[in-house]
Amino acid sequence: ITETLVAIGGRRRLVGVTRYCVRPQGLLWGVPRIGGTKNPDVARILDLTPDLVFANEEENRREDVLALRAAGVEVDVSFPRRVADVAPAIRLWGARIGEEEEADALASRIDAELDALHEAPAPGTFRYAYWIWRNPWMTVSDDTYVADLLKLAGGVNVFGAGRERYPAAAPGDSAARGAAVHFFPSEPYPFREEKHGAEVAGLFGVAPRRLFVEGDDLCWHGVRTLEGLRAVRRLRVYAGEDSSPAGSTGPGTPRAPAG
């Protein structure tokens, strides 16, 4: 949310951010930090006397939202779960901070990218697993923003039907379910090809493609959705190339969808 608020002109209005608000890099220097998403310093927030606090239903705790509201602070709680939810959310945020024009411009760009994808020929499908954690290994269900984004590229989530949004799963489970592509994003777990490439090749086998990608582009909604939709375009091409070598990305292999 912070990165998007800055993108639509809200930097000068920011009086505080969590320690996990790291984007846009270089533009948050001097903004007070008010703790983490799960353990914010409510007293510190009140000392900053904000007119409005932005929160996310999944990332922030209900008790902290209620504490702020009880103290008379207005709290905007959002939770975009689908790519189509993002543009309306941006327009709403723009209206809340008096930046309607900039917000509408950004939302319109996202709408245009999304419309172009819908109007393009339907992509072929590929079965995938998107790993968000290691030890224990965890993945995502279809009830997530990233799964909705990858669906636009033709992705079929082999763990999509799970009741939990972020189910635990063993590496062998994905092979049994027919995953042809494994995604290893840079966040929330910091997967890196140079550090984890050999390990995942041993765990997941050499046949499935292994993509180390920028998690910010695929998991973060808001202004980052633009990069996510561009990644979808690249992934449509990548996933459709049958002649590429199997295994992790590298010289001679197709470009990874992001990063």
Give the positions of each predicted feature.
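N-terminal ligand-binding lobe of clamshell/alpha-beta domains
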Residues: 1-259
